Amino acid sequence: MKKRVYIETTVVSYFAARPSRDIIVASHQEATRDLWPDLTAEYETYISALVYEEAGKGDPDQAKMRLAAIEPFPMLDIDDEARFLAEKIIAGRGIPADYPEDALHIAVAAVNGMEVVVTRNFAHLNNPFTRRAVRRIVEGEGYVCPEICSPQELLEVDK
């Protein structure tokens, strides 16, 4: 049975972005592009309406590329249950109140039984302090907390 994976908007942005001249950013883009075929072949991959909305913003040509990249993935609903959990994540200081969308990504994934959230957002999602706080809050609300990881980390699992 395939693992259920939720991809957050930063992953889509790195996948569809013009190649960077910055060597570190370019390596992140390459890892994200390396993972992309696995997202359809190896995993049940999902997005949410929030990912779709965020991917459609910005430069029209880039937005078109981002939206085309996520077109094959089923979209999860953002319901009251997810909104309530996102509020709990913020209230419990898992995610800063200034970034409610980040809490909503985690909440949508948890409510829908995703096993993994793949993100490039290290500031508010994928760092050891956030992961620990989010896990405590999500599990305290009775959900299984998805693992939060980068594309590189998920690629390592594939090896």
Model-derived features: positions:
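Short, flexible, glycine/charge-rich loop motifs used to bind or transfer phosphoryl groups or to couple energy/partner
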Residues: L35-W36, A107-V108, V138
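Short secondary-structure boundary segments
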Residues: T9, A49, R120-F122
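Acidic, PIN/NYN-like endoribonuclease modules and their adjacent C-terminal/linker elements
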Residues: K2-R4, R18-D22, A26, A110-K159
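Short, charged/polar low-complexity linear motifs in solvent-exposed/disordered segments
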Residues: A31-T32, D102-A103, V144
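Active-site neighborhoods of divalent-metal-dependent phosphate/nucleic-acid chemistry enzymes
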Residues: F73-A133, L155
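Residues at the C-termini of beta-strands that transition into short coil/loop
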Residues: A49, D79, Q152
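Short, well-structured N-terminal submotif of metal-dependent ribonuclease cores
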Residues: M1-I47, E54-L67, F73, A91-A97, ...
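General small-molecule cofactor/ligand-binding pocket signal
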Residues: Y46, L76-D77, E147-C149
